[in-house]
């Protein structure tokens, strides 16, 4: 370290002695000594300044080296990030295109369903018109039936009045019949009484006749005794007169008995005939009344059956009309609801398509911005190379679109702490083919190519219990199986996604399930997933096959599989490394 040269004390008048004039040589030496001292001080200051500058330069050089390393790492990270984002963008574009195609297919299906619904609606309208015509016919028939019913009711009322009259007549006739029966009983009793009297009279007559004969005999005996006394001349006359008198008495008595008997028989026969005639008249009247009553009852029953049939037909017509109206209202509601759902789905599809188009435009904007940034970086590096007069390193081409890449980083420590990054990109075109089949209500809708999830969907309109169901994933010779819980039910039209444990998704049953025992579903060139029910029968399967083809020329990659970005990395200070596709970063 330089130090200042001490200056000897100057002699002057203050030294305590008389001043002596200095010689010119002494003065020149003193001046030279003063100049050397000043130069020595300046040199010391300069050396200190140089040392401080060197120290600062070393610190700045270290900062520059660290900044260069950080910049290189940031550039490498930015490149990897750009590649990842570009791959994600490409994948998103592919997904968007696939989703757009799917949405277009669904839109076509929706249009076809809409046309079919319009046809069904037109058919339902024609059915409605036919039903309305039938309804009017039924109403006309119902009106005619109502008129007939009113007429039948009027006839029924009149017949009921006639029936009441006939019932009254029947009651009267029954009363007359009872009186006739009573009279007949009385006449029968009278007949019996008369017969008894006749029998008693006959017996009395016989008794009297016997007594009369006894009297005659007694008289005859008396007359014989008298005849003995009487003259024999008058005996013949007397006997003649006696016989004549007896004969007259007998005839008179027989005539009286015959007259009395004839009178009794005539009276009996007259009363019996009157009773018989009265009974016959009453019987005929009762029979006619009964016949009229039966006819009235039959007519009333027929009218009642007709009335009940008409009422049944009327109720059936009303029920049919109500059923048709309910069915028509239900069909209208279903058609309106289906049209509303389809319109809402179409609006959602349009919104999704618009959102996807917006996302696609944003991705294009991001891609253009990244291209502009890459171009700006390239121009900046070229300007730095021209300014530093560095030879440009060979450009490395990076292909991002389903490309397999391998990267090796080699770090060499030396005097300048340089890091060499070597990249090699092997571009390839990858085609993915999917095949799926299902024999039941549940199908395998999607298999994630990264092995994060598998999605199932219930395509039916009924809930599907999946207790004991098993899903098997096969990749080559390896296979894993996932079993559903006994209470799990997949709702109608619902999808369920089974995520791997490392997918970074939280469980949200019943639509999102986490397989905690499996970190990934696995990836490979040939992935096959089989769904089996609780009986072990295969109900659905889906396979994904990756086919890799290497193009003949690397320049065709941009057109066939992705976006090609040329990226040149240059060394900003020092001599560039002479390695293929490499750059040296300070």
From Swiss-Prot:
Residues 584-586 form a propeptide. Residues 32-388 form the IF rod domain. GO terms for molecular function: phospholipase binding; sequence-specific double-stranded DNA binding; structural constituent of cytoskeleton; structural constituent of nuclear lamina. Keywords: Acetylation, Chromosomal rearrangement, Coiled coil, Disease variant, Disulfide bond, Glycoprotein, Intellectual disability, Intermediate filament, Isopeptide bond, Leukodystrophy, Lipoprotein, Methylation, Nucleus, Phosphoprotein, Prenylation, Primary microcephaly, Ubl conjugation. Residues 430-546 form the LTD domain. There is a cross-link at residues 102, 123, 145, 157, 181, 241, 261, 271, 312, 330, 532, 547 (Glycyl lysine isopeptide (Lys-Gly) (interchain with G-Cter in SUMO2)). GO terms for biological process: heterochromatin formation; nuclear envelope organization; nuclear migration; nuclear pore localization; protein localization to nuclear envelope. Residues 244-386 are annotated as: Coil 2. Residues 1-31, 388-432 are annotated as: Disordered. Glycans are attached at residue 399. It comes from the Eukaryota. A motif (Nuclear localization signal) lies at residues 415-420. Residues 35-69 are annotated as: Coil 1A. The modification N-acetylalanine is found at residue 2. Residues 82-215 are annotated as: Coil 1B. SMART domains: Filament. This is Lamin-B1. It comes from Homo sapiens (Human).
């Amino acid at each position: 370290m330089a130090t200042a040269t001490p200056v000897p004390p100057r002699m002057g008048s203050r030294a305590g002695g008389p001043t002596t004039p200095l010689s010119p040589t002494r003065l020149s030496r003193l001046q030279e000594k003063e100049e050397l001292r000043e130069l020595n001080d300046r040199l010391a200051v300069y050396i200190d300044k140089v040392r401080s500058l060197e120290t600062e330069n070393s610190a700045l050089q270290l900062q520059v080296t660290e900044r260069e390393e950080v910049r290189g790492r940031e550039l490498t990270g930015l490149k990897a990030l750009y590649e990842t984002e570009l791959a994600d963008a490409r994948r998103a574009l592919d997904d968007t295109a696939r989703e757009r195609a799917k949405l277009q297919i669904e839109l076509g299906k929706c249009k076809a369903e809409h046309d079919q619904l319009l046809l069904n609606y037109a058919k339902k309208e024609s059915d409605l018109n036919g039903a309305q015509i039938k309804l009017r016919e039924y109403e006309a028939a119902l009106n005619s039936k109502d008129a007939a019913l009113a007429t039948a009711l009027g006839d029924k009322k009149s017949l009921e009045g006639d029936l009441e009259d006939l019932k009254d007549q029947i009651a009267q006739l029954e009363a007359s019949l009872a009186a006739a029966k009573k009279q007949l009983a009385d006449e029968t009793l009278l007949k019996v009484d008369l017969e008894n009297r006749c029998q008693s009279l006959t017996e009395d007559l016989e008794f009297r006749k016997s007594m009369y004969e006894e009297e005659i005999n007694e008289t005859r005996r008396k007359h014989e005794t008298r005849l003995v006394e009487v003259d024999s001349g008058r005996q013949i006359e007397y006997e003649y007169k006696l016989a004549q008198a007896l004969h007259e008495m007998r005839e008179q008595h027989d005539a009286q008995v015959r007259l009395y008997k004839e009178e009794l028989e005539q009276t009996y026969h007259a009363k019996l005939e009157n009773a018989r005639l009265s009974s016959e008249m009453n019987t005929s009247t009762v029979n006619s009344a009964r016949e009229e009553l039966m006819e009235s009852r039959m007519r009333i029953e027929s009218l009642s059956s007709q009335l009940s049939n008409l009422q049944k037909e009327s109720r059936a017509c009303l029920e049919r009309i109500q059923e048709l109206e309910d069915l028509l209202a239900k069909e209208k509601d279903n058609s309106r609801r289906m049209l509303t759902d389809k319109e809402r789905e179409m609006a959602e599809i349009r919104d999704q398509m618009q959102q996807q188009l917006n996302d696609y435009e944003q991705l294009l904007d991001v891609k253009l911005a990244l291209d502009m940034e890459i171009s700006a970086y390239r121009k900046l590096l070229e300007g730095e190379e021209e300014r530093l007069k560095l030879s440009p390193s060979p450009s490395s081409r990076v292909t991002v679109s389903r490309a397999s890449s391998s990267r090796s980083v080699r770090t060499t420590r030396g005097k300048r702490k340089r890091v060499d990054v070597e990249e090699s990109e092997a571009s390839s075109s990858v085609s993915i083919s999917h095949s799926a089949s299902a024999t039941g209500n549940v199908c395998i809708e999607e298999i994630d190519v990264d092995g994060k999830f598998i999605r199932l969907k219930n395509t039916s309109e009924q809930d599907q219990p999946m207790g004991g169901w098993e899903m098997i994933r096969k990749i080559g010779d390896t296979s894993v199986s996932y079993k559903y819980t006994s209470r799990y039910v997949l709702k109608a039209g619902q999808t369920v996604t089974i995520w791997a444990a490392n997918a970074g998704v939280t469980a949200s049953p019943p639509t999102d399930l986490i397989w905690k025992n499996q970190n990934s579903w696995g990836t490979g060139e040939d992935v096959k997933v089989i769904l089996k029910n609780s009986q072990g029968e295969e109900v659905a399967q889906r396979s994904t096959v990756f086919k890799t083809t290497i193009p003949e020329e690397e320049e065709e990659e941009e057109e066939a599989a992705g976006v090609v970005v040329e990226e040149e990395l240059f060394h900003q200070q020092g001599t560039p490394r002479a390695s293929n596709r490499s750059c040296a970063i300070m």
